[in-house]
Amino acid sequence: MARTGENIYKRKDGRWEARYISSYNADGKAKYKYLYARTYAEVKTKLIRVQNSVETKVEAEKIRDREKYEFWLFEWLRSKRIGIKDSTYIRYRNVIENHINPDLGKYPINKISTPLMERFVSNKLNNGRLDGNGGLSPKTMSDMLTIIKESFKYAQTAGADTICRFDGISLKRNSQEMRVLSVFEQQQLISVLFEDFDRYKLGVFICLYTGIRIGELCALQWKNISFSEKAIVIEHTMQRLQNDDPNAIYKTRIIITEPKSKASLRTIPLPDFVVKAIKPFVSSPNAYILSGECKSIVEPRTMQNRFKGYLEEGHIGDANFHSLRHTFATRCIEAGFDVKTLSEILGHSSVKITLDRYVHSSMELKRSNMEKLTPILV
C-alpha cells in the first residue's frame, strides 16, 4: 500500500519504506535513497527529518555555486544569447569554455583579485595557445578581458561582491613581427599564380592586390564586381562555425553574413591590371567568384590549403593566408599611400589600427631615406 504523493510504501515483510531524492547527477537526473521503519508514522518522521536536511544541503550548494565565477560567467553568456550574431555567441562560448572557465571558474568571484587576473593574463600571453605553440596575441587577450569585465559587471549588478580591478593590467608580450612577403617572394608567388591561372589562384591574386580578408573573398559573388566602375564591393563574409544543434549530422556549418563592423562594408577601386586578370572568369551575377557557380562555394579552409601549396611550389617561406593582407598594406605604405585612404581600403574601424599595424619602415625604405642625406652632408 502506498501513501499517494509521499513516496512511502508498505513492504511485503511488514516494514514501511520511504524514498527521497538525495541529489542530482550531471544530467539533472534524480538520485534516490531509502529509509525503513516498522510503522508508517516512524518512517514519515524519518523522511521529513532527512528531507529538511537534504533541502538545506541543496540550498547551501546553490549558494556556493552562485559564489563561484563559473556561475556568473555562464549566466552572463545566457543573457547575451538573444541580440547577438551566432558567430559572436559561439566565439564567446569557445573563449569561455577553452580559456576563462578552466582557469578562473573554480574561484569564488569575490576571491578573484587583481594579482590573480594579472597572472592569468600573463600566462595566456606566453603559453595560452590550445595547440601548445606559444601564447595568445594581445588582440585575442584584449577580447578575452572584455568578456571577463562584462561578466563581472553582470555579477555586480545582480549583487555579487568583486574585488578585481582591471585598470593597469598589461597586455604586452614579446612582440612578433607580422609575416610580410618580401618583394622577391611576392614576385615568386605571382609567377606560380600565372602558371595555369585558375579561380583559386585568381582568389589569391585578388587578395594580394586588394587586401581583402579570406572570408570576404570566399563570400564574393560576381555581382560584387563592377567593371564599369572598376571596383569591388565588400558586403559579406564567410566563416565556418560550430553547430549548436546536437542532432546535426555535421559538427560545423558554413555561414555567410555581413562583416562585424560597418567599416568592413566598403568599395575598393581596382587597378587596371587586376580588372584584366578577373575578366576571363566572369560568370552569372549570383555565382561565387571562386566556384563560378551559384550553389557551390569554396570555403576559407580550402583557400588556406591552396595557398600553402602555392608557397611550397614557389619555394617561399611559410606564411598564412592573412599574410597577403599584411603584404598588400605594406606595399601600399612603401608606395606612399596616405594612411586614411589605406585604412578605408582595408576596412579598419579606425586609422589608429592602420598606423599601429602597418606604418613601420622596411629595410628598403630605410635605405632609400638614408640615401637622401648624401647631398646634404657632402
Q: Which residues does each predicted region cover?
A:
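N-terminal DNA-binding module of tyrosine recombinases/phage integrases
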Residues: 11-16, 22-118, 283
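Major-groove DNA-contacting interfaces characterized by cationic-aromatic clusters
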Residues: 61, 65-71, 110, 163, ...
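DNA/chromatin major-groove-contacting recognition/catalytic segments
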Residues: 120, 189-192, 244-249, 335, ...
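Basic, Lys/Arg- and aromatic-enriched nucleic-acid-binding interface segment
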Residues: 134-138, 142-144, 157, 161-163, ...
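Conserved tyrosine-mediated DNA breakage-rejoining catalytic core shared by Y-recombinases
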Residues: 220-280
